Amino acid sequence: MNWQTWRHITKLDPDKVITKEEIAEIAASETDALMLSGTLDVTPENLAELYDNVRDAGLPLTVEPADPSCARFEGIDYVFVPSVFNAGHPAFITGLHKEWAQHADILWDKVVQEAYVVLNPNSSVGKLTRAKCDLTPAEVAAYGIVAEKYYSMPVLYIEYSGMYGDPAVTRAVSEALSTTRVFYGGGINSGAKAAEMGQYADTIVVGNAVYEAGPAVLKETVKAVK
């Protein structure tokens, strides 16, 4: 299994309700993987419940923990760990990571480091991390260069979190990087938007559309990039 070949990831929130029928439709959508991830009210308990519901979906399973308590390895193929480069609070850059490294038994061969740039100031993640979101495409691309050239991080994640972003940002980041993979997430709720961001991003991540528009729209976004 090679996550670097994935073009489409479906993000599911442990704090949101999803039915078995919807999970079956997601599994049939040809999305490349499931990412279990949320910003608020995610606990080891509701993460475990969501895992139990999707474990037999036949798709690669990943977790993107908001804090160390939800960094689950059992039954998980990869743990994508975000470091919010434009956070206003150092805990979300390296602080929580230090606590995790100090106190947890980490299976490092399953860890994928993500350099996050959060660009929606009204989102939960934007507020929680106090992210500086008024960045130009060139500034976001510069974060990407730091991630790739200085930290050798495998992922630069452009996160608009519920809001459709500026394709110029994704394009600028894509053109600036050569080895780091570009992930884009935020506001993709149609095939047209998936195609627009997918021409620049290596991987698009679709989350809210699953809950707001249903698996049929998810399938449309998959077809647009694969």
UniProtKB/Swiss-Prot annotation:
Location (main, coarse): cytoplasm
Pathway: Membrane lipid metabolism; glycerophospholipid metabolism
Record-listed sn-glycerol 1-phosphate binding positions: K11, Y157, I158, E159, Y160, S161, G162, G187, G207, N208
GO cellular component, one term: cytoplasm
Protein's GO biological process: glycerophospholipid biosynthetic process
Xref: Pfam families: PcrB
Cofactor entry: Mg(2+)
Enzyme class: transferase
Domain of life: Archaea
Assigned EC number: 2.5.1.41
Binding positions for Mg(2+) per the UniProt entry: D13, T39
Localization terms from the record: Cytoplasm
UniProt key word Cytoplasm: yes
Gene3D superfamilies tied to this protein: FMN-linked oxidoreductases
Record keywords: Cytoplasm, Lipid biosynthesis, Lipid metabolism, Magnesium, Metal-binding, Phospholipid biosynthesis, Phospholipid metabolism, Transferase
Substrates-to-products reaction catalysed: sn-glycerol 1-phosphate + (2E,6E,10E)-geranylgeranyl diphosphate = sn-3-O-(geranylgeranyl)glycerol 1-phosphate + diphosphate
GO molecular function: magnesium ion binding; phosphoglycerol geranylgeranyltransferase activity
NCBIfam families registered for this protein in UniProt: GGGP-family, GGGPS_Afulg, PRK04169.1-3
Family annotation (HAMAP family): GGGP_HepGP_synthase
Entry's family note: Belongs to the GGGP/HepGP synthase family. Group I subfamily.
Function: Prenyltransferase that catalyzes the transfer of the geranylgeranyl moiety of geranylgeranyl diphosphate (GGPP) to the C3 hydroxyl of sn-glycerol-1-phosphate (G1P). This reaction is the first ether-bond-formation step in the biosynthesis of archaeal membrane lipids.
The protein's name in its UniProt record: Geranylgeranylglyceryl phosphate synthase
